[in-house]
From Swiss-Prot:
Domain of life of the native organism: Bacteria
Gene Ontology MF term list: 1-deoxy-D-xylulose-5-phosphate synthase activity; magnesium ion binding; thiamine pyrophosphate binding
GO BP term (any one): thiamine biosynthetic process
This protein's UniProt keywords: Isoprene biosynthesis, Magnesium, Metal-binding, Thiamine biosynthesis, Thiamine pyrophosphate, Transferase
Protein name as it appears in the record: 1-deoxy-D-xylulose-5-phosphate synthase
Biological pathway: Metabolic intermediate biosynthesis; 1-deoxy-D-xylulose 5-phosphate biosynthesis; 1-deoxy-D-xylulose 5-phosphate from D-glyceraldehyde 3-phosphate and pyruvate: step 1/1
Residues that, per the record, bind Mg(2+): 146, 175
Note on cofactor: Binds 1 Mg(2+) ion per subunit. Binds 1 thiamine pyrophosphate per subunit.
Signal peptide: none
Role this protein plays: Catalyzes the acyloin condensation reaction between C atoms 2 and 3 of pyruvate and glyceraldehyde 3-phosphate to yield 1-deoxy-D-xylulose-5-phosphate (DXP).
Length: 618
């Protein structure tokens, strides 16, 4: 028997399906997504939560001309399947395969590319205003989660939307179940009255009857209005949006296609901004994801039947950072941790359990996090802001203006520095060296191995200025002794031989070390330096290399432009030396999705390519 998903041809089929067929399609879509992600990895829980929501959107709107923007974008799998990309899921997030996020080059139905949170309302408003200025007629819909709504950019956009009354539909996908049972039931009841077209007529009729009561009628009606407004302010969460000038519907059951379609159809025909508050269950339909949605947010391949993923044997940098924070904080009460909704991802769970009053999760608010850290530093604390490289760039101005200008002792623990792999352009952490290097007072460090990270963090917290420590996703297989005592701007010599010296940073030291060992087996010697400090560079060591007239190869997992290699090259040029400097890093382009090892090979930064580069310079 052919199932509904196999019979499905294009988005117009959805409008011709019965409610039973749509519900059956929902179940089949979930099964397909679970099976696909179990094989290739990806974002599971968020996608399972928006199946009915996505079907309802396509049931009501026509996104061949209407516009749909997914905030963050990791919940777009159903959308991609419905728009003809089901076959691409066998290569999901692989090089040249289907992206895990909206991509305009993939489909005419991907109207805007996303990856970071809180951007959808702004981009949707831009499209809506362009529509109005050009005299066109289409709907614009933004889907944003309750977590992303904590981002300042989303709130700025809401303020603008409500002020100018531009026609726009915002779907607030609330998957945190933040509405309690009693309040939730009452809120749903009140919402159903507000959605019902007879509600306003009923309200007018009651007010009319009361006003006809001799002597006291008008006064009672006014007081009734005040009471009604007071009750709504207390009990109806949507009053926040109503007061901003945005019509509110909800909360709605995000897994009820009939109810969702009804409300969306009403919003579609309104001439003002509308927000539809839907409540969904993250991981819906797969018990392991429902029970542990955080684990199944972004996950590698796993066993479909048990939900168990392949366990990593080694210690990741994130885990090492978390353990180091616990160890250091137990000895120094000034140390506090800050995270922007990434407590689990950055390894701070144990810290959170042991020091509940010394960890601050500010939500998706990196700008606020950095300036709050600056305030803490001025008051005598030692704040550590743990953040992914790609998200720190959202707080560039705060790092420069609020931390560096005042030369404050804030430590930036930059996780996922360098390649992160399958999440692609929006998440690769290959810019932090460049945008931090030109900030006065900033020191940048990179451990060569997991063990070195704790000693580096200890040293950073003893300094009186801003320090950034960058480290990659995953583990280190480098079996070398860590540096335990650091001297600012001093590098570590791992091998001082030959006429070529590789100066490598962070995880790239492991690749350089393996290349050195391969050459050693061929009786070829080269030098190897662990550039523990990306900034300041070790000028004394560089002067020694210049005096010995060695060729320098710099190796970094950052874009070359403005990066570590550029700093070395500029210094050598300033000395008027003629020695050759070769910078190996990423080109001036955005790096696509794919496995980390495949991407290193693609950009000529795998061990084989580095070895060839060394041999060319012999």
């Amino acid at each position: 028997m052919i199932n509904t998903l196999d019979r499905y041809k294009d988005v117009y089929d959805i409008k011709n399906m019965s409610l039973d067929e749509l519900n059956l399609l929902s179940r089949e879509l979930r099964n397909f997504i679970i099976e696909s992600v179990s094989q290739n990895g990806g974002h599971l829980a968020s996608n399972l939560g928006v199946v009915e929501l996505t079907l309802s959107l396509y049931n009501v709107f026509d996104f061949s001309y209407d516009k749909l923007i997914w905030d963050v974008g990791h919940q777009c799998y159903v959308h991609k399947i419905l728009t003809g990309r089901r076959s691409g899921f066998q290569n999901l997030r692989k090089i040249n395969g289907l992206s895990g996020f909206p991509k305009r080059c993939e489909s005419k139905f991907d109207h805007f590319e996303t990856g970071h949170s809180s951007t959808s309302i702004s981009s949707a408003l831009g499209m809506a205003r362009a529509r109005d200025l050009k005299g066109e007629n289409y709907n614009v819909v933004a889907v944003i989660g309750d977590g992303a709504l904590t981002g300042g950019m989303a709130l700025e956009a809401l303020n603008d939307v409500g002020d100018n009354k531009t026609k726009l539909t915002i779907i607030l996908n609330d998957n945190q179940m933040s509405i309690g049972k009693n309040v939730g039931g009452l809120s749903t009841y009140l919402s159903s009255l507000r959605i019902d077209p007879n509600y306003n007529k009923f309200k007018r009729d009651v007010e009319g009857i009361i006003k006809k009561i001799p002597n006291i009628g008008k006064g009672v009606a006014k007081n009734l209005e005040r009471v009604k407004d007071g009750v709504k302010q207390v009990l109806v969460p949507g009053m926040l949006f109503e007061n901003m000038g945005i019509k509110y519907f909800g909360p709605i059951d995000g897994h009820n296609i009939k109810q969702l379609s009804k409300v969306m159809d009403k919003a579609k025909n309104m001439k003002e901004p509308v927000i539809i508050h839907v409540v969904t269950t993250k991981g819906k339909g797969y018990k392991f994801a429902e029970q542990n949605p955080d684990k199944f947010h972004g996950i590698g391949s796993f066993d479909y039947m048990t939900g168990c993923s392949k366990k990593s044997k080694g210690v990741t940098y994130s885990k090492a950072f978390g353990k180091a924070m616990v160890s250091i904080a137990s000895k120094d009460k000034r140390v506090v941790a800050i995270t922007a909704a990434m407590k689990d991802g950055t390894g701070l769970n144990e810290f959170s359990n042991k020091f509940k009053n010394r960890i601050f999760d500010v939500g998706i608010a990196e700008q606020h996090a950095v300036t709050m850290a600056a305030g803490m530093a001025t008051a005598g604390l030692r704040p550590v802001f743990s953040v992914y490289s790609t998200f720190l760039q959202r707080a560039y101005d705060q790092v420069l203006h609020d931390v560096c200008i005042q030369n404050l002792p804030v430590v930036f623990a930059i996780d996922r520095a360098g390649l992160v792999g399958e999440d692609g352009e929006t998440h690769q952490g290959v810019f932090d060296m460049s945008y931090l290097s030109h900030m006065p007072n900033m020191t940048i460090m990179a451990p060569k191995c997991v063990e070195e990270l704790e000693f580096m963090l200890n040293w950073a917290l003893s300094q009186e200025s801003p320090i950034a420590i960058r480290y990659p996703k995953g583990e280190s297989r480098l079996n070398l002794k860590p540096i335990k005592n650091f001297q600012k701007g001093k590098w570590e010599v791992l091998e001082d031989k030959g006429k070529i010296s590789i100066i490598a940073t962070g995880r790239m030291v492991e690749k350089a070390f393996n290349v050195k060992e391969t050459l050693k087996e061929r009786n070829i010697d080269i030098g190897l330096i662990n550039a523990t400090f990306v900034k300041p560079i070790d000028k004394e060591m560089l002067n020694k290399i210049i005096d010995e007239e060695k060729t320098i190869i710099t190796l970094e997992d950052n874009v070359i432009l403005g990066g570590f290699g550029n700093s070395v090259l500029n210094y050598v040029r300033d000395t008027n030396s003629n020695i050759k400097v070769v910078n190996l890093g990423f080109k001036d382009e955005f790096i696509p999705h794919g496995k980390v090892d495949d991407l290193f090979k693609m950009y000529g930064l795998d061990e084989e390519a580095i070895l060839k580069e060394v041999m060319k310079l012999m």
